Amino acid sequence: MYVGYLLDKDNNMYPNPVRHPGLNLNPQNYVPAPPQYSDFPSYHHVPGINSDPHHGQPGGTWSSYTPSREDWHPYGPGPGASSANPAQISFSPSDYNPVQPPGPGLLPPSLNSSVSPLSPSAQRRNLYEWMRRTGVPTSTNSNGKTRTKDKYRVVYTDHQRLELEKEFHYSRYITIRRKAELAASLALTERQVKIWFQNRRAKERKVNKKKMQQQSQQASTTTPTPPSVGTTAGMGGLCSSSSSNSNLVSPSSMPIKEEYLS
């Protein structure tokens, strides 16, 4: 502040310079009564040098001790603090605190309750309980249907499967008339009978395809057959004939040999 600057500048005028307590404090921690210092019980003031009447007051009139520097809040000085008289204006920390803790009366009744009725996870679990899927089928109802992951699957009885298998071995493709008769006798719908025949044909194709693959693998893993005996005999005959021909001497070569001998 400006007054503090003058005091620091004119150190020669004061043998025992004592700063006014309001010059080093922030406005929010300033108290009207100046503190009492044990090191400076009183000091002499030369009248007429400074127009501030507070410098002439003895130190014994100071009644309270200001809080330590660690207790000060990091707030800057407010507007007009340098020109105002410390004895006329007082500040409190609550004036410079922008966020005030709300009292119990300011909160709505829903926020005053200590424990909420339901947590967010419990609410989410209750809202989406119907979306859960179970991997294990549930119990069968009276219509002979059971619930799987995302569709209904018909559970056939042993008698129904036996009659359907008999009909499938008789004819792989059932006619419309026979389908209606079989559905009426087995207490099924025509659509259920049709779907069973479709699934049964698909199963048969899968089994036949697997058998063909196994047969092809067995044929590829068999060892190759050795060469036949006739081929080896032919090869031997050719070799013997060639060796016998090599021992024979042509008649044209005889006189040539005789000429060389003579």
UniProtKB/Swiss-Prot annotation:
<protein>
    <recommendedName>
        <fullName>Homeobox protein CDX-1</fullName>
    </recommendedName>
</protein>
<feature type="compositionally biased region" description="Polar residues">
    <location>
        <begin position="82"/>
        <end position="95"/>
    </location>
</feature>
<feature type="compositionally biased region" description="Low complexity">
    <location>
        <begin position="108"/>
        <end position="120"/>
    </location>
</feature>
<dbReference type="GO" id="GO:0008327">
    <property type="term" value="F:methyl-CpG binding"/>
</dbReference>
<dbReference type="Pfam" id="PF00046">
    <property type="entry name" value="Homeodomain"/>
</dbReference>
<feature type="DNA-binding region" description="Homeobox">
    <location>
        <begin position="149"/>
        <end position="208"/>
    </location>
</feature>
<feature type="compositionally biased region" description="Low complexity">
    <location>
        <begin position="213"/>
        <end position="232"/>
    </location>
</feature>
<feature type="compositionally biased region" description="Low complexity">
    <location>
        <begin position="240"/>
        <end position="253"/>
    </location>
</feature>
<comment type="similarity">
    <text>Belongs to the Caudal homeobox family.</text>
</comment>
<dbReference type="InterPro" id="IPR047152">
    <property type="entry name" value="Caudal_homeobox"/>
</dbReference>
<keyword id="KW-0010">Activator</keyword>
<keyword id="KW-0539">Nucleus</keyword>
<dbReference type="InterPro" id="IPR001356">
    <property type="entry name" value="HD"/>
</dbReference>
<dbReference type="GO" id="GO:0000976">
    <property type="term" value="F:transcription cis-regulatory region binding"/>
</dbReference>
<feature type="compositionally biased region" description="Basic residues">
    <location>
        <begin position="203"/>
        <end position="212"/>
    </location>
</feature>
<dbReference type="InterPro" id="IPR017970">
    <property type="entry name" value="Homeobox_CS"/>
</dbReference>
<dbReference type="GO" id="GO:0000981">
    <property type="term" value="F:DNA-binding transcription factor activity, RNA polymerase II-specific"/>
</dbReference>
<feature type="region of interest" description="Disordered">
    <location>
        <begin position="42"/>
        <end position="120"/>
    </location>
</feature>
<dbReference type="GO" id="GO:0005634">
    <property type="term" value="C:nucleus"/>
</dbReference>
<dbReference type="InterPro" id="IPR020479">
    <property type="entry name" value="HD_metazoa"/>
</dbReference>
<keyword id="KW-0805">Transcription regulation</keyword>
<dbReference type="Pfam" id="PF04731">
    <property type="entry name" value="Caudal_act"/>
</dbReference>
<dbReference type="GO" id="GO:0045944">
    <property type="term" value="P:positive regulation of transcription by RNA polymerase II"/>
</dbReference>
<keyword id="KW-0238">DNA-binding</keyword>
<feature type="region of interest" description="Disordered">
    <location>
        <begin position="203"/>
        <end position="262"/>
    </location>
</feature>
<feature type="region of interest" description="Interaction with DNA">
    <location>
        <begin position="152"/>
        <end position="173"/>
    </location>
</feature>
<feature type="region of interest" description="Interaction with 5-mCpG DNA">
    <location>
        <begin position="191"/>
        <end position="202"/>
    </location>
</feature>
<keyword id="KW-0371">Homeobox</keyword>
<keyword id="KW-0804">Transcription</keyword>
<comment type="function">
    <text>Plays a role in transcriptional regulation. Involved in activated KRAS-mediated transcriptional activation of PRKD1. Binds to the PRKD1 promoter. Could play a role in the terminal differentiation of the intestine. Binds preferentially to methylated DNA.</text>
</comment>
<dbReference type="InterPro" id="IPR006820">
    <property type="entry name" value="Caudal_activation_dom"/>
</dbReference>
<dbReference type="InterPro" id="IPR000047">
    <property type="entry name" value="HTH_motif"/>
</dbReference>
<dbReference type="InterPro" id="IPR009057">
    <property type="entry name" value="Homeodomain-like_sf"/>
</dbReference>
